[in-house]
Each structure stands twice: as C-alpha cells, then as structure tokens.
C-alpha cells in the first residue's frame, strides 16, 4: 500500500486548499477544524486504508466507515467564528469526500 504518511499529507493539503477556496474569511478556522478532525481520526483512517488495500473491506465499506466519523468532525472553530451552518456542513462533507477519494485512489494504486 502507498505510504500512509504521504497519503495523509496529501489529504491535509487538499483540505487546506478547499478551506481557502470555499471558506474565504473563515479559511484559518476551517483548516484548524479539519486538522483537528484528521489528527483525531488518523489511526482509524490508517487501519481502514490498510484493510481496503488488503481487500478485507470494499470501497463502499470504507466510505461508510469514513462517513461514520461525521459526528467527530465538529468544526468548533468555524462555529465559534459564526460561519453559517450550511457552509460548515458543506465543508465538513467535502473534507470527508476528500478523505474517501484520496484513500481509495491510493489503495487502488497499491493493488
């Protein structure tokens, strides 16, 4: 499987760009929230990516596992900065989509 640290850094870079593009005035809070979520979820993501690469779970199961972490992605800094609820939820969902897409691509490349 691809080096997890490289994949994880790629996810963080993509999320940072997303925050700057979609959140504009709230980009620093979005980056902070995404980084907190990714750091808290890192060990789970690594385990699930390995299971996916080893074909012990399929893409749908991986996607479900990542999306089950939605509650963990609280986005507190964005809420405290009074970013709109719809904007926060859209950003959170986009972060999860980046995680899924990047991890699946890396796992497929490893096969």
Map each language-model feature to its residues.
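Cationic, hydrophobic amphipathic alpha-helical membrane-interacting segments
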Residues: 1-111
């Amino acid at each position: 499987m691809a080096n997890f640290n490289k994949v994880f850094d790629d996810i963080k870079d993509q999320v940072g760009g997303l925050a700057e593009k979609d959140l504009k005035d709230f980009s620093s809070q979005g980056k902070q929230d995404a980084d907190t979520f990714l750091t808290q979820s890192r060990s789970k993501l690594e385990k699930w990516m390995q299971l996916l690469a080893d074909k012990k779970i399929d893409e749908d199961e991986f996607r479900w596992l990542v999306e089950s972490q939605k509650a963990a992605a609280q986005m507190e800094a964005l809420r405290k900065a009074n970013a709109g609820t719809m904007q926060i939820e859209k950003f959170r969902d986009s972060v999860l989509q980046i995680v899924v897409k990047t991890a699946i691509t890396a796992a497929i490349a490893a096969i």
